[in-house]
């Protein structure tokens, strides 16, 4: 019996109790909250449903709680139900009912933890979207890991997810990038507002190698050749780095296409037609303050050029017009103002603003020996995705980025993540999976299988702890999807690995040399197999490998 199953049982029991007394059953919450008590001596689970509804039905909380506890205790799945404090109900499951969790995991396999929470939803998930003017930096690396993991979690929750990279190839930053390449090719100093680093020289040299006569072209043609070829080469490197990192995209959307296709002009005309654009002081303004923004925004400047928000307006419209009903933007710490701005843009275009979500990620720093690591040899100024992978590997880089909430700034201690010890979180979790695989191999060598185990034998405290932890996984995935917080999966994996290691230290899973296999060994092997499955499922959701040997 999973916590979700127990929640349903408690609710149905409450409905029966209230109905028998001709009391209002509509006061019950949609989902009865079931939690594990801090003190395991109090039981396996606890609920406060009696406290929630007692006053609404005119009963004393303890009196109602006792009636509910007595009714629950009559169920064969419940070993004990008792009242504590002002009306909490503590519940201890029967061993057979608790063991059902193991059977459910083994039956569901790789889909355990999945749900239909967002079945039928089409989600556009835009993340990374770094300018094609340099390698992916640490902020982009965080989004590459977290965004990919969030996509996996949403898909596990039934959503159809489009992973999208917005390719900023329209604007002043491309001019600066081009000027930097040209200066490098000519052997001139980097422009004052240009980009430095070895990668600029590498790309400039590659452009010259591909087009030997490029430096003899007229200035306009020379700049265009370096712009087009340089951006193409830089973006190819970005794609390659992301692919090796385990992050791929379904759509690479070019900002420039919004202008070339007429999408920006079309969006502006729509806003004029629906009255959400007005002319003032030589410019066209969006009535964004009417839709929750802190002020109106200039869309067409007095010189006739489109402001940056013009592309944002056309882009959000394009996302909805492609059939997405939820658009999630994952942006850097300097984009807080975009939350109200993008929602206002959607509303002004006639779309539901609540279907636009903006997640803001905080800064990432690398630390070694207690000091910040700031320089990248290749990039010149910032640490890159490639630098991090080279230092701690792909799994370490992904996991280090995912395991903390993006709401908080992140310091990555390179010494910690380089260790092959239990102090390293990803090593700790992966070692748990590898140890479980080793157990499965040894069981196979001994001819022991987990077919038709008697799971009611799993009564040891460590067995119960492990089973209850496994049972939490579906709720963890659900919360990670609803709250857009994939770090919950990583933290759960660490908790599960720790609970397993404690079980392993306390319970003999396989018979000792010279002993015959007993039913308890079969039951514990089934529990170990279920744990291996859930650890693998969790690691898959964060995009980290589940090694069979370490």
Curated annotation (Swiss-Prot):
The protein's assembly and partners: Monomer.
Gene assigned in the entry: argS
Main location: cytoplasm
Keyword Ligase: yes
Positions occupied by motif 'HIGH' region: 130-140
GO molecular function: arginine-tRNA ligase activity; ATP binding
GO BP annotations, alphabetical order: arginyl-tRNA aminoacylation
Enzyme class: ligase
Location in the cell: Cytoplasm
Gene3D superfamilies, A to Z: Arginyl tRNA synthetase N-terminal domain (3.30.1360.70), HUPs (3.40.50.620), Isoleucyl-tRNA Synthetase, Domain 1 (1.10.730.10)
Keyword annotations of the record: Aminoacyl-tRNA synthetase, ATP-binding, Cytoplasm, Ligase, Nucleotide-binding, Protein biosynthesis
Protein name: Arginine--tRNA ligase
Catalytic activity from the UniProt record: tRNA(Arg) + L-arginine + ATP = L-arginyl-tRNA(Arg) + AMP + diphosphate
A Gene Ontology cellular-component term: cytoplasm
Family stated for the protein in its record: Belongs to the class-I aminoacyl-tRNA synthetase family.
Entry EC number(s): 6.1.1.19
